[in-house]
Amino acid sequence: MVFGYYAAAIGRAFFPTKNEYASLMLSLMTFGTGYLMRPLGAIILGAYIDHHGRRKGLLLTLALMAVGTLSIGIMPGYETIGFFAPLLVVLGRLVQGLSAGVEIGGVSVYLAEIATPGRKGFFVSWQSGSQQVAVIFAALIGLTLSAVLRPEEMAGWGWRIPLLLGSMLIPFLFMLRSSLAETDEFIARKHRPSTSEIWRTVMTNWRLIILGMMLTTTTTVTFYLITAYMPTYGGSVLHLTAKESMLVTLCVGISNLCFLPIMGALSDKVGRRPLLILFSTIALITPYPVLLWLVSAPSFGRLLAAGLWFSMIFGSYNGSMVVFLTEIMPVNVRVSGFSFAYSLATGLFGGFTPAVATWLIHETGNRAMPGLWLSFAGLMGLTATLVLTAPGFKHGAHQSGRPVDAVHELPVG
């Protein structure tokens, strides 16, 4: 996330060119490259978690994330080590991507399996809620740094501070995860599938994986548009101050944190389907008009209003989407299947949202074009929801031939 916030500064440090657009694009493409590793992480680490347990897997993913984040934070720039600088930064992003490929799935499934009956949506929503805490933390640091550092200091070394501060939290997170108990549902399972069995089951359910990817695309594109890309869009495109852009990002993170548990709890009451259909439709129809209104007279107030509107879409859709994805996956490969679908969406669509948005604006000259990218994501989510909740569509474990238990516990529509 921090990488996306400071893409322009990181681009100048590791990808120096005479063309500012080229430098920014190289940085954003490196940001996106980490997401290409997520499907691989979902396969390898997801299988590990489905076989060895949730707790062990969450410790492993945290260790990998720590290595990737710290390596980028301490990496010398291009002027110091030349070609090795961008090469090693890309490597750090790949390690981050490998870990992140199963982080969301591992935590979401853990929360789903420890949730009390009838409150699964509320419990699982806190996985995404924890991401918003990171967004808020990064934005607060960004606001502080922009207030005390000159622009040249921020570009030279200030962007490293959030990465290093984030790395300092790792020991605390290790202690927290080490204290977690394994879920009763996993302990009760008599059969622990091998990696080959897990991969075979995932591939057998390829249609479910594709639909899960489409379902998740709405979430990932919206999230990275309003968080990772927001500071770049506000500063480089709308020419607002860094303080204004980061303040909007902070407000968006707080708004996300409010909407997610509320809508997760609401999905426990009314079902996942109505909320998914409603907010994917809003994501399809409203983004371009909202951004067109914003760019017609750019201001802090309008950027804040647009950001909060998209935050409402993200929080409301994601509050029911993540738990729904845990419910439709085959039981024995719940982490692997969830993570693979989620990682495909992030790797192919969400992670490259900042780069795609920048390219669309550069090629067309239309600063509202990112809205069409978000509308495309909304269409993906709406289509997947209608198919997955259609009468007769079967979810669940291929091996057992029955739907995932959670689908029966809670109403889908």
Predicted feature descriptions by range:
Residues 16, 63-81, 281-297:
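C-terminal ends and interior cores of transmembrane alpha-helices
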Residues 3-4, 206-255, 349-354:
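Extracytoplasmic gate region of multi-pass secondary transporters
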Residues 274-320:
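C-terminal transmembrane helical hairpin of 12-TM major facilitator-type secondary transporters
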Residues 81-101, 300-316:
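Hydrophobic core of transmembrane alpha-helices in multi-pass small-molecule transporters
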Residues 51-63, 269-280:
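Cytoplasmic membrane-interface "Motif A"-like loop-to-helix N-cap segments
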Residues 42-54, 260-271:
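Helix-to-loop junctions at the C-terminal end of transmembrane segments
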Residues 6-38:
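Extracellular/periplasmic helix-loop-helix junction of adjacent transmembrane segments
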Residues 122-146, 341-353:
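Glycine-rich segments within core transmembrane alpha-helices of 12-TM secondary carriers
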